């Protein structure tokens, strides 16, 4: 069994945050990420700290957040131990990079990515550890070409790790990013995985490296293709309406958000994924035969790519 090196994981995550921020700034051409470094004082429920980076009012990106955090605690919150009683009584560390990018142009999809590592330790016992993460795409005016290239990149990332990895993690993504009260997916999916520890540590670590580094490879070509398409008030209004679904999912269903808030995490960083503007409209129905209707009919349900 390969040795568990949580320090190497932390170094990778911090360098990944740097790399993603640099690539997004280059694509935007104007805005830069502003860093808010934070740490927890001794005696708080959670120790540790992180680097929250936010970009606002760019040429391409209306708002984006790329967050690194490394927190530790003496015991798990009840929300976690209810599902995993073996974690009770163990000190834990959780570290990861999480990001959400909200573009200006409605023809450029919103995107999200996350890679994370968790370890719970108790003296005299083997550590309990796992990796999680993935990336997913939320278009407002989808292009078949973009959705296909997004999933083709995901397939290429997964291929070296096993012939079933893409299919499993793609299906998991479709299931996870689903809004039951709306009976629709949040977007066109991608990859999602959690509790990844059935391979050797080194192989699991290599996989999250590939996913983390693959995010920009998948997303930035789509941004480049769509960022200069002309749009008007109608497209902007629909973009804001669909952003409301993002808010609904994150506040009602997202496990990371719920875990962070319940465990005493840093609220500003946890809610960094929220769009700067969103809107709701009572009983909205897209007009038949419109691009807005096509989103509902063809893209907000699981499909094979």
Swiss-Prot record:
Binding site for substrate: 98, 114-116, 264-266
Gene name, Swiss-Prot/TrEMBL: hemF
Subcellular location: Cytoplasm
Listed Pfam families: Coprogen_oxidas
Keyword annotations: Cytoplasm, Heme biosynthesis, Metal-binding, Oxidoreductase, Porphyrin biosynthesis
PROSITE patterns for this protein: COPROGEN_OXIDASE (PS01021)
Protein name as annotated: Oxygen-dependent coproporphyrinogen-III oxidase
Function: Involved in the heme biosynthesis. Catalyzes the aerobic oxidative decarboxylation of propionate groups of rings A and B of coproporphyrinogen-III to yield the vinyl groups in protoporphyrinogen-IX.
Active site annotation, chain numbering: 112
Superkingdom in the source lineage: Bacteria
Catalyzed reaction equations: coproporphyrinogen III + O2 + 2 H(+) = protoporphyrinogen IX + 2 CO2 + 2 H2O
